[in-house]
């Protein structure tokens, strides 16, 4: 598998090998939302490059305790994937259509990655060692 490691937020995530070269990652830190959240966006690169969204999922990392019934970000559907003393990590799926509606091949490629989401959810590990300090 491919390993994505985020030292700032103290977590790693395994992705299936067939994701190699197909995924683009955008990292946003210190968002002005719920006492300073962090959001890592994973895109299906070919769909995103085509200007058609392509968001596979987000990893939200927020200080404090959050649950699936009370997530820090309301849009989409969140699953708690890890919890440390200071942070909750959630995998959030987009609430709108992100696959290509014009190119069936692109749509199929996107869907094949989405179909492996359960693998991702069970392969996210928080180290508890974050570089950013939680807001007091």
Question: Where are each of the predicted segments found?
Answer:
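Short, low-complexity, polar/charged sequence segments that are solvent-exposed and flexible
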Residues: 62-64, 78, 109-113
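Short, surface-exposed beta-strand/loop micro-motifs that present aromatic residues
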Residues: 74-83
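N-terminal low-complexity, Pro/Thr/Ser-rich intrinsically disordered segments
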Residues: 1-5
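Short, solvent-exposed coil/turn segments at beta-strand boundaries
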Residues: 17-18, 83-88, 94
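Short, surface-exposed beta-strand/loop "edge" segments at domain boundaries and coil↔beta transitions
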Residues: 46-57, 89, 96-105
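Surface-exposed amphipathic alpha-helical segments
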Residues: 91-136
């Amino acid at each position: 598998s491919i390993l994505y490691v985020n030292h700032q937020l103290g977590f790693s995530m395994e992705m299936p090998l067939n994701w190699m070269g197909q995924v683009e990652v955008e990292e946003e830190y210190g968002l002005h939302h719920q006492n300073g959240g962090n959001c890592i966006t994973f895109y299906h690169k070919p769909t995103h490059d085509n200007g058609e969204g392509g968001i596979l999922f987000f990893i939200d990392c927020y200080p404090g305790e959050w649950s699936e019934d009370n997530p820090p970000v309301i849009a989409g559907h969140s699953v708690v994937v890890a919890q440390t003393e200071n942070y909750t990590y959630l995998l959030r799926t987009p609430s709108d259509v992100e696959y290509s509606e014009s190119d069936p091949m692109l749509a199929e490629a996107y869907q094949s990655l989405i179909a492996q989401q359960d693998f991702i959810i069970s392969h996210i590990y928080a180290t508890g060692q974050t570089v950013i300090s939680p807001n007091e």
